[in-house]
C-alpha cells in the first residue's frame, strides 16, 4: 500500500531545516560539492548504506566533485515521510563528509 503524500506544510517545514534542499515536481532535490572526486564517490556509498537501512532508495549522479541527489516515493507519486526522513539523513551525512550544498 502506498505511503500517504506529505502535505505542503510538512515539506516546507522540513525544507526550512535542510539547507540547499528544494522541492521540484514531486521530488526532493539537492546538490553537494565535496573537496575531491574521491570524497564525492565515498559520500554516495554512505547514501547507499542509509538507503538500504531505510529500504527507500534515492537517485544520484556524480559530476566530478558534485553529487546530485533526488528522492521521491514512486508508489505514492510524490514526496512522503520516507523522503523527508531520508533527506534529513542525507543532509547529516553530507555535513559529516564536508559536503557543501550548491545550486543544482
What spans do the regions from the language model cover?
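Long, contiguous binding/interaction regions
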Residues: 1-104
Amino acid at each position: 500500500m502506498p505511503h500517504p503524500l506529505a502535505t505542503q506544510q510538512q515539506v516546507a517545514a522540513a525544507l526550512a531545516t535542510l539547507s540547499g534542499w528544494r522541492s521540484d515536481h514531486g521530488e526532493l532535490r539537492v546538490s553537494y560539492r565535496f573537496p575531491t572526486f574521491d570524497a564525492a564517490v565515498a559520500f554516495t556509498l554512505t547514501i547507499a548504506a542509509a538507503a538500504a537501512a531505510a529500504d527507500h532508495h534515492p537517485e544520484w549522479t556524480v559530476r566530478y566533485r558534485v553529487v546530485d541527489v533526488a528522492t521521491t516515493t514512486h508508489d505514492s507519486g510524490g514526496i512522503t515521510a520516507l523522503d523527508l526522513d531520508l533527506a534529513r539523513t542525507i543532509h547529516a551525512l553530507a555535513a559529516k563528509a564536508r559536503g557543501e550544498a550548491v545550486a543544482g
